[in-house]
């Protein structure tokens, strides 16, 4: 797929407890920050936090399916998570 100047792509998702559970089942990330409300209430987050890998996965989908699209392979990635994502939040990936 050719990319043109000014071309854009976006993907959004509202993250649910089911998404967090499925991601944990696939990866083994059962950190109590994602599942234990009593635990999170004692942290700076105060609410259940979505796994970082789940949020960054939306960017993977955007690149692999939308821009540039099928056949794309990541050779390197770096992520910074400036704020937590909570269950019920809607996130958007843009390229």
Residues covered by each model-derived region:
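Hydrophobic beta-sheet segments that form the core/acyl-binding groove
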Residues: 75-95
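Hot-dog-fold acyl-thioester-processing enzymes
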Residues: 1-73
